[in-house]
Curated annotation (Swiss-Prot):
Catalytic activity, reaction form: S-adenosyl 3-(methylsulfanyl)propylamine + putrescine = S-methyl-5'-thioadenosine + spermidine + H(+)
Residues that, per the record, bind S-methyl-5'-thioadenosine: Q36, D111, D143, G144
Protein location: Cytoplasm
Gene Ontology terms for molecular function: spermidine synthase activity; thermospermine synthase activity
Name recorded for this polypeptide: Polyamine aminopropyltransferase
Source organism (scientific name): Pyrobaculum islandicum (strain DSM 4184 / JCM 9189 / GEO3)
Length: 291
């Protein structure tokens, strides 16, 4: 750890006109990998954080808001998720949440950047909580696009695909994984009642990028649900999109969600039955936008 001798801040661009300034207390990692700049730092307000190419990916104090909202709405909507594919999520928190579901027999996490995974194992224990040692977990260091094409050729099948990638507008690495063509490939990777969920960045600052992802999901899935969650360390509400071949996440009651969480032994800090119902009810301005 390197203590910061004076006032040092992360200046994160939220848009072309707005920035978020976050005070840094200590630096644990500053490294440029083959793909991106990696920083792991202790922040004043959000605790330890993983920062990629100047964007906070997750932080100790609010990561549960992000990861639980990404994982559990889709997982709970599926009646019995056994095989789960995670694209991205190198810090291990998405894998951690997926494996809370006792129905899961296999969770494959595919991340292109081995440095992110290895540095997270060492410096972000509160994120992964030892999940990499779970016998149900498989970690593959590979481009997600390449992995999916190989899995299709091999006839592999999944019940749930979780896309925990960098934003479609903040990095070049993941852009092709948000394309309509890629979502069509994911349909081929799913069982007949499969579900995907992706984080889709921020629709307030980047509506065109968000709409691109939304239209891509809608072009491949008969059931689509949108929701968003405010993440303090991001400085904005993150958008999520679910694409489902059968089950409708908006049809679940709070009681049904709680029943499935209890049956599967899932304990959470943010997500609940009432939270699920609230997430699936878009604000008026979002509903109007899609009329």
């Amino acid at each position: 750890m390197v203590s910061v001798p004076g006032p040092v801040s992360l200046i994160e661009p939220l848009s072309g006109n707005t920035i978020l300034v976050i005070k840094i207390n200590a630096l644990h990692v500053v490294k440029r990998s083959k793909y991106q700049e990696i920083i792991i730092a202790d922040t004043e307000d959000f605790g330890r954080a993983l920062i990629l190419d100047e964007y906070i990916q997750s932080s100790y104090y609010d990561e549960a808001y992000y990861h639980e909202s990404l994982v559990h709405p889709a997982m709970v909507t599926h009646i019995s998720p056994r095989d789960v594919l995670i694209l991205g999520g190198g810090e291990g928190a998405t894998l951690r949440e997926a494996l809370k579901h006792s129905t899961v027999k296999r969770a494959v996490m595919v991340d292109i950047d081995e440095d992110v995974v290895e540095l997270s194992k060492k410096y972000l224990p509160q994120m992964h909580q030892g999940v990499f040692e779970d016998p149900r977990a498989q970690v593959v260091i590979e481009d997600g696009f390449v992995y999916v094409e190989k899995a299709l050729k091999n006839g592999d099948k999944f019940d749930v695909v979780i896309m925990d990638l960098t934003d479609p507008y903040s990095s070049e690495i993941a852009k092709q994984l948000y394309s309509p063509e890629f979502f069509k490939k994911l349909v081929g990777l799913l069982r007949e009642d499969g579900i995907i969920v992706t984080q889709a960045g921020n629709s307030f600052f980047f509506p065109e990028a968000y709409d691109m992802v939304l239209h891509g999901v809608k072009s491949s899935f008969p059931v689509v649900a949108e929701y968003n969650v405010w993440i303090p360390s991001f400085g904005y509400a993150v958008n999520y999109i679910i694409g489902s071949l059968k089950y409708d996440p908006t049809s679940l009651t709070a009681e049904e969600v709680e029943k499935r969480l209890k049956e599967r032994g899932v304990k959470t800090l943010f997500y609940s039955g009432k939270t699920h119902v609230g997430l699936m009810n878009l604000p008026i301005y979002r509903k109007i936008r899609h009329v």
